[in-house]
């Protein structure tokens, strides 16, 4: 069910069947390895935790028949905009608004996928919509920071995230708690924590790709 993106790479890494790229960003300069950059990166991880798991919270509310699932979706939209607001000091309000808006529409489409699966409807049309939304987001981020945010890498990361959301929806509907746990773990890794770069076999997360890219593009902003 995963969409394959072909790259000229010498090795591939997988997490629960999902292909991910090894870490691409070089170690940060010593001048910016400090408390400020650590807090900056941890703040972004918190934002992406709320966004990536907010989608799962929506499915829990929807499948559990909780009346306020619409409120959960509203919170998910706010989480998407908060991820966008993170860009304000470095790329301005318009860029932040656009990124937040794209993350919101990706989440809204995710809510439609969750609803379609519950109703046993085909989701291929929604997957096509996701592909277009992700392409627009990856293209825009790459324009802001071409050196540190390669479009194909971002494409792959977000496609994997949406695929893992779908995996978790299916697992919850089937009451397969093992598959649910595996999907949740993979979501956190692809969106938030990544895998440590042990002998170049780790991979970075969406959150760390974004924060390290900002730091690497504007290192003096973070120097103490």
Where are these regions (language model features)?
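C-terminal amphipathic alpha-helix
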Residues: 16-17, 24-30, 34-69, 73-76, ...
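Serine/threonine-rich low-complexity intrinsically disordered regions
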Residues: 2-15, 21-23
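Mid-chain, structured segments of secreted extracytoplasmic proteins
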Residues: 80-111
């Amino acid at each position: 069910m995963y969409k394959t993106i072909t790259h000229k790479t010498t090795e591939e890494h997988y997490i629960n069947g999902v292909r991910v790229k090894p870490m691409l960003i070089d170690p940060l300069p010593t001048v910016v390895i400090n408390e400020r950059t650590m807090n900056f990166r941890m703040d972004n991880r918190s934002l992406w935790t709320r966004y990536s798991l907010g989608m799962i919270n929506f499915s829990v509310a929807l499948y559990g028949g909780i009346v306020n699932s619409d409120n959960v979706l509203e919170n998910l939209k706010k989480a998407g905009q908060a991820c966008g607001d993170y860009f304000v000091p470095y790329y301005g309000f318009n860029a932040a608004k656009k990124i937040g808006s794209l993350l919101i529409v990706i989440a809204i489409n995710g809510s439609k996928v969750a609803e379609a699966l519950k109703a046993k409807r085909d989701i291929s049309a929604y997957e096509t919509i996701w592909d277009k939304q992700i392409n627009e987001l990856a293209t825009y981020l790459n324009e802001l920071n071409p050196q540190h945010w390669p479009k194909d890498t971002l494409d792959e990361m977000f496609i994997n995230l949406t695929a893992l959301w779908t995996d978790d929806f299916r697992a919850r509907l089937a009451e397969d708690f093992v598959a649910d746990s595996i999907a949740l773990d993979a979501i956190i890794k692809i969106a938030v924590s990544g895998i440590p770069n042990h002998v170049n076999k780790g991979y970075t997360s969406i959150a760390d790709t974004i924060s390290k890219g900002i730091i690497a593009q504007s290192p003096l902003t973070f120097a103490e």
